[in-house]
C-alpha cells in the first residue's frame, strides 16, 4: 500500500504527493536534477502512466529532468520478465529511453542488482547476471549517443532482504572477488 496516496488526487486524477514533491523541489532545489525514479519492470501500461504523469507535472510548470529505473532484477514478479525475456524487455527499455530523450529527459538506471534465489547455484546465477548486464549495457551505450544515460549499482557485493530466501548480487562476491558481471562492465567501459 502506498500511504502517500492518502493525500489525494488532483482534479485530473494525478497524485498530489507527486505534484507537491516536484513543486517544492522546483522551487527550492533549482540546481539539483529532479528524477522521477520508478521501481518495477518494463510493464508498458505502468510506463505509459508514468510518461503521462511526467508530462502533466511539466505542464504545471514544475521541472522533471530525468527518468530513473530502479533495476532490482528478479526482486519481484514485476522484474522477472527482464531475466526470462531479456531481448523483448530491453527493447521496451530502449523505447523508453528514446521517449525520454525525445522529451529532453535524461535516463538513469539506478540501483542495479540481480537476485539469486538458489545460492547453491551461484555459478549459474552469476552467468545469467552477466548475460543480462551485457545486454543491458549494450542498450545503454547505444542510447547514450542520443542523450544522457547513466548506470549505478545498488551495492558492490551481496546483500540479503529480511524474510526473503536468496541474495542480491552485484559485481563482487562474498570475498570481494570480481564476478562475471564485473568483467562485463569493465569490458564495456574500455570500449
Where do the protein language model's features map onto the residues?
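Alpha-helical scaffolding within the catalytic cores
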Residues: 12-23, 40, 45-58, 88-98, ...
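Active-site acidic/histidine proton-transfer and metal-coordination neighborhood
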Residues: 1-24, 29-36, 42
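Aromatic- and acid-rich polysaccharide-binding/catalytic face
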Residues: 28-40, 50-86, 101-115
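Aromatic-rich peripheral "rim/lid" segments of glycoside hydrolase catalytic domains that contact
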Residues: 1-12, 80-108, 113-191
Amino acid at each position: 500500500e502506498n500511504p502517500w496516496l492518502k493525500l489525494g488526487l488532483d482534479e485530473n486524477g494525478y497524485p498530489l504527493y507527486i505534484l507537491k514533491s516536484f513543486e517544492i523541489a522546483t522551487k527550492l532545489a533549482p540546481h539539483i536534477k529532479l528524477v522521477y525514479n520508478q521501481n518495477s519492470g518494463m510493464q508498458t501500461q505502468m510506463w505509459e502512466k508514468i510518461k503521462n504523469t511526467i508530462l502533466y507535472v511539466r505542464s504545471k510548470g514544475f521541472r522533471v529532468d530525468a527518468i530513473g529505473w530502479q533495476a532490482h532484477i528478479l526482486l519481484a514478479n514485476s522484474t522477472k520478465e527482464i531475466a526470462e525475456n531479456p531481448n523483448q524487455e530491453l527493447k521496451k527499455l530502449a523505447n523508453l529511453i528514446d521517449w525520454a530523450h525525445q522529451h529532453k529527459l535524461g535516463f538513469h538506471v539506478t540501483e542495479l542488482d540481480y537476485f539469486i534465489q538458489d545460492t547453491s547455484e551461484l555459478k549459474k546465477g552469476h552467468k545469467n547476471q552477466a548475460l543480462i548486464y551485457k545486454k543491458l549495457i549494450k542498450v545503454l551505450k547505444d542510447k547514450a549517443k542520443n542523450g544522457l544515460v547513466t548506470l549505478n549499482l545498488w551495492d558492490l557485493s551481496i546483500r540479503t532482504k529480511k524474510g526473503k530466501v536468496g541474495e542480491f548480487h552485484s559485481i563482487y562476491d562474498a570475498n570481494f572477488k570480481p564476478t562475471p558481471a564485473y568483467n562485463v562492465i569493465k569490458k564495456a567501459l574500455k570500449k
